[in-house]
Amino acid sequence: MIKNENREAKVLAQNICMSVFKARRVIDQIRGRSYEEALMILELMPYRASYPILKLVYSAAANASHNMGLNEVDLFISKAEVNRGTIMKKLKPRARGRSYLIKKTTCHIKIFLKEKYKV
């Protein structure tokens, strides 16, 4: 009997000060890619969202190698998702004693790494 182990390394970052749409633009480029290919893509992307995601991919690979004993060369990004986080509200003073509401959006990022199946 062949035992199929579903071992996944995951990493979660919460309340990253970034728009969900801007983070999704970067995440969509690396979903389903190998670990090394995702690192190359993230290092060359000109977006501000790529640096926190790069740190998360590094962390997920470190979790996979340290906690589960997986080889980093065989890893690929099985799932990557960006969800809306809390919205921080601030008041900006305006003329004549009024104030406007400023909404600072945050997002939650989850990245899952799996090992490629060897045939």
Curated annotation (Swiss-Prot):
InterPro entries: Ribosomal_uL22, Ribosomal_uL22_bac/chlpt-type, Ribosomal_uL22_bac/org-type, Ribosomal_uL22_CS, Ribosomal_uL22_sf. It holds the Pfam family Ribosomal_L22. Gene3D superfamilies: Ribosomal protein L22/L17. It is found in: Plastid, Chloroplast. One of its GO terms (cellular component) is chloroplast. One of its GO terms (molecular function) is rRNA binding. CDD domains: Ribosomal_L22. Keywords: Chloroplast, Plastid, Ribonucleoprotein, Ribosomal protein, RNA-binding, rRNA-binding. GO terms for biological process: translation. This protein binds specifically to 23S rRNA. The globular domain of the protein is located near the polypeptide exit tunnel on the outside of the subunit, while an extended beta-hairpin is found that lines the wall of the exit tunnel in the center of the 70S ribosome. Belongs to the universal ribosomal protein uL22 family. Part of the 50S ribosomal subunit. NCBIfam families: rplV_bact. This is Large ribosomal subunit protein uL22c. It comes from Phalaenopsis aphrodite subsp. formosana (Moth orchid). The gene is rpl22.
